[in-house]
A protein has these predicted regions:
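N-terminal secretory signal peptides that target proteins for export/translocation
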Residues: 1-16
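Short helix-loop boundary/capping segments
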Residues: 198-206, 216-270
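Bacterial N-terminal signal peptides
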Residues: 21-31
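Solvent-exposed N-terminal domain segments of exported/luminal and surface proteins
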Residues: 38-199
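Sec/Tat signal peptide C-region and signal peptidase I cleavage site
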Residues: 31-37
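Short, low-complexity cationic-aromatic patches
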Residues: 153, 183, 206-217, 275-291
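Extracellular/lumenal glycan-associated surfaces
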Residues: 156-162, 184-186, 214-229, 287-301
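Long, compositionally biased interface segments
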Residues: 38-40, 44-46, 271-363
Length: 363
């Protein structure tokens, strides 16, 4: 029988306990760090705010009573330059569009793009090469295919609720067409994919920063605008956003309260451990010890694909007469123009409907 000396036995026992101790400490540190995730109202630009942010009681979608920051933002931040959107003619250059039909990809709105759509059965221009442009979506369209360039309404205000401390959901919430994603630090709301031309027949043109005007008259993003040039470089698109670009800077807070960043982490590396929502736990400038946050990617739209946390009820309300967040959201009919499509195999939730829907507000 081999007898282990007492000092070696103690060392063996200590070594056996070490992994559990390290694991426990790691879990404790992770939980402590996660608790640091919070919305900081002072980060939002005063150029977008109608009044100072307020802390209010709110109810999350899962019934949790908590505290939210309430921000009342303008139709567009003071001094923000937007456009171009729809080009007046084929000789002009407009914004961008992520085409999801045949020859799919990210395109500049120019002659080559619209002539390509012509070959696919979508006709956005007349014989004189002027585009069909709609600026008022309350009116019935004359043409089957139109480029949407909605007029701004300076009177519109938007009220946004963000949980001050994020609460992780039991399951991530998928983000469909025109789903509410968050509020950029410049005060511009952020939404998921704009409605497809394949569904509506119309093209809601985006400018080169990935934004456009809602039917209600207010400007919003469909991309991480402060890192969108990464997309152009990746996909070979000749475009540039006039906003300062940064791979690492915080762009926004999602509606669940978690922060949103560019394509790289605080150390300048592209994260390799992103989850299905394009998020992960890792260090940020405000929390070097780590917090959960989302990252932009090199695919359009470079936004979260789902939300990890729980959002507040009534988290986006506008004073607009139509569009998202207003009492009136017009219905979406079958997409006019283009070749006939067989939608019999599409899930019922994807079928065009006459019922009001968020997606319909940007036909």
């Amino acid at each position: 029988m081999t007898i282990t000396p007492p000092h070696r036995a103690a060392a063996v026992r200590h070594k056996a306990r070490l992994p559990a101790a390290v694991l426990s400490a790691s879990v404790a540190m992770l939980m402590a760090a996660a608790a640091h995730a919070e919305v900081v109202p002072s980060q939002f630009s005063s150029a977008a705010l109608e009044k100072a942010p307020e802390t209010v009681s709110c109810t999350l979608e899962n019934g949790t009573q908590t505290q939210c920051t309430r921000l009342v933002v303008k139709y567009k931040p003071d001094g923000l330059k937007t456009g171009p959107f729809c080009p007046p003619s084929l000789d002009d250059e407009g914004g961008i569009w992520d085409w999801d039909g045949e020859n799919s990809g990210l395109y500049r709105l120019d002659r080559a793009f619209f002539e390509m759509l012509d070959t696919l059965g979508f006709h956005f221009h007349d014989d004189d090469e002027s585009l069909h442009i709609m600026t008022d979506l309350s009116k019935r369209p004359v043409e089957a295919n139109n480029c949407l360039n909605v007029a701004e309404d300076e009177s519109v205000e938007m009220t946004v609720l963000l949980p001050l401390e994020p609460v992780e959901a039991d399951e991530p919430t998928p983000l469909g067409t025109v789903a509410k994603i968050g509020l950029a630090l410049d005060g511009v709301p952020i939404f998921a994919d704009a409605p497809s031309v394949l569904d509506t027949g119309n093209l809601p043109a985006l400018d080169t920063c990935g934004g456009h005007v809602d039917p209600g008259g207010w400007y919003h993003w469909h991309a991480t605008a402060t890192d969108i040039d990464t997309l152009y470089d990746e996909h070979g698109v000749d475009a540039h956003c006039q906003l300062p670009q940064s791979h690492t800077a915080q762009f926004a807070y999602a509606f669940d309260g978690y922060p949103m960043f560019g394509t790289q982490d605080s150390g300048g590396s592209v994260p390799t451990d992103l989850d299905s929502c394009n998020g992960h736990f890792g260090p940020t400038e405000r929390h070097p010890e780590g917090e959960y946050h989302y990252h932009a990617t090199d695919e359009f739209p470079n936004l979260p694909k789902c939300l990890k946390g729980v959002v507040a009820k009534d988290n986006f309300v506008t004073t607009a007469s139509m569009g998202i967040g207003s009492p009136r959201i017009p219905g979406q009919g079958p997409g006019p123009g283009g070749p006939e499509k067989d939608t019999s195999d599409r899930p019922e939730s994807d079928q065009p409907s006459e019922a009001p829907s968020q997606a319909s507000s940007e036909q």
